[in-house]
Amino acid sequence: MKLALRVAYDGSAFYGFQRQPGVRTVEGEIIKVLQKLGIIESPEKNDFKGASRTDRGVSAFFNVVSFVPSERPDLARPEVLNHHLSDVWVLGIAEVPDDFHPRFWAKFKTYRYYLVNEGFDLSAMRECASLFVGRHDFSAFAKLEPGRDPIREVERVEVIERQGYLVIEVQGKSFLWEMVRRIVNALRFCGLGLLEAEEVERMLSGEYGKKIPPAPPEGLVLWHIEYPGIGFEGDEKGIKKARRDIFERYSRALTRAALFGDFLLEY
């Protein structure tokens, strides 16, 4: 039996997703609780895997981990796990095939970036956004790791206008390190008149002098991962606990935003 958990988390509370010694990570928090409850013995023995290794500061509304429970699979449900987890919430669980891998089975991933509207030229942003769709060399828009192919295919980039802010949605099967955050910053530069569509086209063909720097990680969230044929089931008490925790964070953030908003109005 193999189980998969859909997890959400507040990225500002962690040094990234992937476990590493001496710092608090999302994987580390989940593994600690699974071991505490006797569901797994170790990540290696129980084939613990994650879908997306989000960077420090990046949040998720839909990431996935999978493992083979040693015993007590009945405890691996949102109600129980969310009672023990901190800054991570289990929103659903699914029993999956033995060969399931959360990264390789993903059909596509959708990221969202939340961007305060600085008076952007939205038509220029959308023109630039359309250039990223398709198969391109993203060397200028990524922090390249040795041996990794810079060619990636992006399925969709949308600029969605909200009241006072924008949501940038980027969808594709796989992404390079910092790729989404650098795409977002390119769109921001286009919206401010600091970057032209022709320059973006050249950069996507591999012609560039300087790379686009990444936007801050705090605005990015892994919004969705599509797994055909797999449904994650939650439970009422577990979801209620998650909603309560997330509302507390929303309330604190809104209070701080209102405070600094009045500062700006006064000065």
Swiss-Prot record:
Belongs to the tRNA pseudouridine synthase TruA family. Formation of pseudouridine at positions 38, 39 and 40 in the anticodon stem and loop of transfer RNAs. SUPFAM superfamilies: Pseudouridine synthase (SSF55120). Keywords: Isomerase, tRNA processing. It is an enzyme of class 5 (isomerase). The keyword Mitochondrion does not apply. It comes from the Archaea. One of its GO terms (biological process) is tRNA pseudouridine synthesis. This is tRNA pseudouridine synthase A. Its EC number is 5.4.99.12. The active site is at D55. GO terms for molecular function: pseudouridine synthase activity; RNA binding; tRNA pseudouridine(38-40) synthase activity. It catalyses: uridine(38/39/40) in tRNA = pseudouridine(38/39/40) in tRNA. Substrate binds at Y111.
